[in-house]
């Protein structure tokens, strides 16, 4: 059976890169005594795949890993086993069974992701910058420079910026694990295209906006938290998008 596990990554774990996070989760499965399926051959490894690697320095309430298991667990049992053995900053939120097959893996389904950007004290946008941003995201065309292994490429990110809202209400600011949560107005919510098709990072949106205003990007100004990751079940026709959280594609195990 294949299980999709949803977990949060907070606190100091935001400084851990993707490969180290993979090793961390493998050790967690071993410590928890979960009966994981291993590949065959000379170098057996756990059969598991990660949906959408998180950038270093970001926190998340929506990390996903698909794991093949040799025996059945209830969702509650598996979540409890993992949380009892989890390191500080990692908290398992849910576990659900998903169909086998390459087409059902989380990494092949990712199409959209939500983020909250929380400004550090003293770096908040004033009302004039907020209004400028609201006008900027409404443009029909927004050119940004995307960097990849093949070099730099100018792309229009406007069609892939699904939503951009400056919060009028206080929201939680994700900080170090032993700090008390802060609440502050002015957080920025972004919903962006994600995955292997067209992946738009929230820091690319911010850097492009700042550069368009003739200023230098300042990554220290804000903290980024990934709120949710979605699959698109709507098909390829224009206007037919139907986004569903990856965990929503699974079945609760009794």
Segments predicted by a language model, with ranges:
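Extended, well-folded interaction surfaces typified by the phenylalanyl-tRNA synthetase beta subunit core
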Residues: 6-8, 12, 16, 20, ...
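Core RNA-modification/binding signature centered on pseudouridine synthases
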Residues: 138-254
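Short amphipathic alpha-helices in soluble, non-transmembrane regions
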Residues: 78-86, 126-138, 205-206
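Short beta-strand-to-loop capping motifs
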Residues: 7, 67-73, 117-123, 190-196
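Short, charge-patterned binding micro-sites
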Residues: 38-69
């Amino acid at each position: 059976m294949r299980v999709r596990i949803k977990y949060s990554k907070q606190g100091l774990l935001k400084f851990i890169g993707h490969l180290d996070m993979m090793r961390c989760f493998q050790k967690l499965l071993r410590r928890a005594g979960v009966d994981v399926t291993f590949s065959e051959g000379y170098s057996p490894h756990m059969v598991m795949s990660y949906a959408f690697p998180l950038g270093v320095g970001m926190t998340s309430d929506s990390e996903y890993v698909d794991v093949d298991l040799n025996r059945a667990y209830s969702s509650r049992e598996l979540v409890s086993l993992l949380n009892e053995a989890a390191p500080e900053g990692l908290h398992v939120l849910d576990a659900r069974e998903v169909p086998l097959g390459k087409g059902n893996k989380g990494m092949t389904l990712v199409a959209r992701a939500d983020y909250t950007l929380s400004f550090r004290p003293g770096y908040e946008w004033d009302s004039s910058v907020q209004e400028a941003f609201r006008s900027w995201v409404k443009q029909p065309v927004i050119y940004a420079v995307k960097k990849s292994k093949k070099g730099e490429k100018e792309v229009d990110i406007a069609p892939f910026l699904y939503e951009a809202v400056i919060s009028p209400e206080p929201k939680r600011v994700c900080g170090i694990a032993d700090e008390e949560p802060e609440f502050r107005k002015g957080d920025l919510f972004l919903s962006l295209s994600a995955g292997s098709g067209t992946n738009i990072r929230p820091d690319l949106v911010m850097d492009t906006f700042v550069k368009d205003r003739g200023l230098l990007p300042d990554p220290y100004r804000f903290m980024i938290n990934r709120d949710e990751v979605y699959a698109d079940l709507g098909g390829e026709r224009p206007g037919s998008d139907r986004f569903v959280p990856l965990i929503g594609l699974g079945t609760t195990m009794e």
